[in-house]
Amino acid sequence: MKRTIKGLAILLPACALAVAACSDTATSSQSEHARETVSVVLDWTPNTNHSGVYLAMARGYYEQAGIDVEILPYSEAGSASVLLGGGADFAFEGAYSVIAGKARGDDMTMVFNLQQESSQGIAVRADNSDITRPADLDGKLFATWGAAEGVAKVQTMIRNDGGQGNVETALLGTSAYAAVYNGTADYAEGLTTWEGIEADLAGTPVKWFMPADYGVETTPAELGLVTTPAYLRDHSDLAKRFIQSTQRGYKDAISDPSGAVDALLNANPDVAIDRELATRSQELLSSQYWKDSAGSVGHGDVDRWQRYIDYLEGAGLLEDANGKPAFAGLRGADMVTNDLLE
């Protein structure tokens, strides 16, 4: 601090320095004491879906908000299970997981709706001339992640394209493009924003059928950050600081895809992430998928959530805790909120 009274500065230099030193120490101590930890469990190995968090970390946004972020690795149990079991404060999850959990009595709320438009499609070998449209999938083998919603989606696509909707399934244990090239299945579900690019780079290109093009009600949130109502109640201010810092990171990732890729790779030196794959994926996500209907990033569309819930209930795709069909009149407004966003 600059002194304006010369005599005081001459008479009390030692005292002034001592006070300043004490003040700095106290401020530092308070800052360290005030820092709070937030844990986030990933839905898969680190990839471009998570780059906004890593960019927010690299640019000090969490630190400025008094937060230390702990990234927890993907668990075979699933990120929702880790969250509900108290193993994390936030989890990367999609709308289907939140809704299906609610039907079973598991309470989760999406507080950051990362991707409103789905990039999940049905992959077929690009050189497969026997399959040129969804109707051609009838009776053929489908490699799926196992969710009933995925099978119903394909059946709807086939029927809406003039087929019968006969689907044979096999559990997808590898990437979509690998499954259709190694003969595991005739077609598989996957993400155009990652596996589609990966397939091209591997020299095994695939062609895609997108569910929305064939009358399927698609997810209102391919991915987002979820937490529990209890956490929001007990840590409302911390949750808001965390989400707004995260939102800053994803805004930066939209405007600076290369910076997002650098942050992702620098934070995960032990993870084999191909830079070209990450770069092309990030450019696609930043330019086509992350900007929301509000012109920003992170907002959830409650009306779309409700339409998707109504579709899932009407198709019998939700079960209660006893494994019986759930028709509970679930409300999207109970599962997604924009209240923590800037």
Question: What positions do the PLM features span?
Answer:
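C-terminal motif of bacterial Sec signal peptides marking the signal peptidase cleavage site
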Residues: 17-21
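Bacterial N-terminal signal peptides that target proteins for export
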Residues: 1-10
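Short, glycine-/small- and polar/acidic-enriched structural segments
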Residues: 30-173, 177-182, 186-190, 209
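Bacterial lipoprotein signal-peptidase II cleavage site
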Residues: 22-32
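Conserved C-terminal helix/tail region of periplasmic/extracytoplasmic solute-binding proteins
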Residues: 305-342
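Secondary-structure end/capping motifs
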Residues: 234-315
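Pocket-lining segment of extracytoplasmic ligand-binding domains
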Residues: 96-97, 175-179, 183-270
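Short, surface-exposed acidic
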Residues: 164-168, 270-282, 319-330
